[in-house]
UniProtKB/Swiss-Prot annotation:
GO molecular function, one term: single-stranded DNA binding
Subcellular location, record wording: Cytoplasm
Protein name as catalogued: Protein RecA
GO cellular component, one term: cytosol
Predominant subcellular localization, coarse grouping: cytoplasm
Binding site residues for ATP: 66-73
Protein encoded by which gene: recA
Family named by the database record: Belongs to the RecA family.
Keywords in alphabetical order: ATP-binding, Cytoplasm, DNA damage, DNA recombination, DNA repair, DNA-binding, Nucleotide-binding, SOS response
Source organism of the structure: Rickettsia africae (strain ESF-5)
Domain of life of the organism encoding this protein: Bacteria
Entries under SMART domains matching the protein: AAA
Presence of keyword DNA repair: yes
Alphabetical list of PANTHER family matching this protein: MITOCHONDRIAL DNA REPAIR PROTEIN RECA HOMOLOG-RELATED (PTHR45900:SF1), RECA (PTHR45900)
InterPro entries: AAA+_ATPase (IPR003593), DNA_recomb/repair_RecA (IPR013765), DNA_recomb/repair_RecA_CS (IPR020584), P-loop_NTPase (IPR027417), RecA-like_C (IPR049261), RecA-like_N (IPR049428), RecA_ATP-bd (IPR020588), RecA_C_sf (IPR023400)
Length: 343
């Protein structure tokens, strides 16, 4: 077959497919209208840089997992706040029935515009999510959490009844159904997940996430979030030192990590990140306990500098802008290349 005949055959096949399934159902990759991946900020400057595209990608599935009280819900509430700032509509599927509206409001979430559902079963939760995503009106949907998506058969059964992998089957079926709708509507679907321990593991990490393996494969980005220490004011604990690791990333190189502070009552401390990244990039000078910007001392001690940046937002925004401009030069934000994941 000559090249001309091949081109005609392909053109005829494409025309037939478009006639059957609609315009845009098949095309050459270069003809796609949106080639660049859009992103929504996570609310953490360091994590935005670690993700490589300035935030979480639109039209993809995201998994955020970690131990209890590690900051999973706090991070997702910051995601909602950032999406709403861009004019996006967000939905929260609260399967754990534990969302605190007052805390969400403190983190910048417009609770009057946030759609919330507290379903009774896993099937109901995922059907609601599917309907909202298919509407094309939702920009971000949060499912909190995968562990709380209890199958109807388990709820209606007796305590102690064996339910072999029913949750894993439910998740596998739901993700097969959801993934095309998520991509087509450019919606961000964020699944919060918990950690469990595998029994009898002799080598490697015994930790695993709930809901089977389907979410690991369908997720474009997987974020591991951990509490690594406390922030104290004298004897009182006022926050948590937090480390996040991007263990899977289909839109940028994975395995990058970032550290930030989560302050109780106010969420991720942007000022703390600006100081740390500013020092790392030589934008902010540190001499002993003193910090300087443009040869002007801005405070002694990290907490005092954080307060200074809160009181002088124009300087904070200026440093943040320079950090984002220089972020392409950061090849290692506490990057750990010794660990690998073959998802």
């Amino acid at each position: 077959m000559s090249n001309t005949d091949k081109e005609r055959a392909i053109a005829a096949a494409l025309a037939q497919i478009e006639k059957s399934y609609g315009k845009g159902s098949v095309m050459k990759l270069g003809q796609r209208p949106h080639v660049d991946i859009e992103a929504v900020s996570t609310g953490s400057l360091g994590l935005d840089i670690a993700l490589g595209i300035g935030g979480v990608p639109k039209g993809r599935i995201i998994e955020i997992f970690g131990p209890e009280s590690s900051g999973k819900t706090t991070l997702t509430l910051h995601l909602i706040a950032e999406a709403q700032k861009k004019g996006g509509t967000c939905a929260f599927i609260d399967a754990e029935h534990a969302l605190d509206p007052a805390y969400a409001k403190k983190l910048g979430v417009n609770i009057d515009e946030l759609i919330i559902s507290q379903p009774d079963t896993g099937e109901q939760a995922l059907e609601i999510a599917d309907t909202l995503i298919r509407s094309s009106g939702i920009d971000m949907i949060i499912i909190d959490s995968v562990a709380a998506l209890v199958p109807k058969s388990e709820i209606e059964g007796e305590m102690g009844d064996a339910q072999m992998a029913s949750q894993a089957r439910l998740m596998s079926q739901a993700l097969r159904k959801l993934t095309a709708s998520i991509n087509r509507t450019n919606c961000i679907a964020v699944f919060i997940n918990q950690i469990r321990m595998k029994i009898g593991v002799m080598f490697g990490s015994p930790e695993t996430t709930t809901g089977g393996n389907a979410l690991k494969f369908y997720a474009s980005v997987r974020i591991d979030i951990r509490r690594i220490g406390s922030i104290k004011d004298k004897e009182e604990v006022i926050g948590s030192q937090t480390k996040v690791k991007v263990v899977k990333n289909k839109v940028s190189p994975p395995f990058k990590t970032a550290d930030f502070d989560i302050m109780y009552g106010s969420g991720i401390s942007k000022e703390g990140e600006i100081i740390d990244l500013g020092v790392k990039l030589d934008i902010v000078e540190k001499s002993g306990s003193w910090f300087s910007y443009k040869n002007v001392r801005i405070g002694q001690g990290r907490e005092n500098v954080k307060q200074y940046l809160k009181e002088h937002p124009q300087i904070s925004n200026e440093i943040e802008k320079i950090i984002r401009e220089k972020s392409s030069k950061i090849t290692n934000i506490n990057l750990d290349q010794t660990e690998e994941e073959n998802d």
